């Protein structure tokens, strides 16, 4: 066993017995007063450059930022003297630290926000659904929407991933798409040919009807002879799921402008072609489809609905 030197004995005798005084002498305590030797050491370290000390300070800020959530969870409030300014300074200096902090969060920063009509659908943030009602309109995170959660098992046809594939598989199905074709023919005989040369119109009708229920399309023309489609949905409220918005914006958003508005007592999704972009047509037998549509029988209720909605669209333009 090594002999105990007198200096070691003196040092032990000078150490305070009170634990509180021991903490005051610890270098990490806030009331600790550095000795001349420790001050000399700090000066020698500072010669390494300001950048290293700044990096060390940011690392300390980062270590506190990583534990800020856990402190709030354990104690209910933040008991440290760590300011928000220091926190955001550390986040801005270390991008990875910011991502780590977001991973520790239990709830999203922004779940829902109010929106106003008319609203462009292609400008909405991805992963959100649209809820419209007489009490207000909101854009809600799909994972926090009870309607989207309850309808998460809704089957989405694989053909919806392609505009042209959906058009090719459904353009000859006259009876299932009777409302689309009757409205197209009611607009004008030439509108049938124009509608068949714009596959995105039938695609938008199929996707919107699949997710939003019964709809009635009304057609009009722009100044260049291209068709504009108004999809009217009856009811006091409307929910457009995030999957529906994603399919519409990704597949026809580059060539068509998509907007939702309130026309009279009905919600309306307007599908209008962009002026500088043209879509690729799909080769189909237009004459055979026209003959099938011309002889199509439909009830007076559907014809009256198309007439009323057409008048409503014309009045809304004025």
Swiss-Prot record:
Keywords: Host membrane, Host nucleus, Membrane, Metal-binding, Phosphoprotein, Zinc, Zinc-finger. GO terms for biological process: viral budding from nuclear membrane. It is found in: Host nucleus inner membrane. Signal peptide: none annotated. GO terms for cellular component: host cell nuclear inner membrane; membrane. Coiled coil: none annotated. InterPro entries: Herpes_UL31 (IPR021152). One of its GO terms (molecular function) is zinc ion binding. A zinc finger (CCCH-type) spans 129-239. Plays an essential role in virion nuclear egress, the first step of virion release from infected cell. Within the host nucleus, NEC1 interacts with the newly formed capsid through the vertexes and directs it to the inner nuclear membrane by associating with NEC2. Induces the budding of the capsid at the inner nuclear membrane as well as its envelopment into the perinuclear space. This is Nuclear egress protein 1. It comes from Epstein-Barr virus (strain B95-8) (HHV-4). The gene is NEC1.
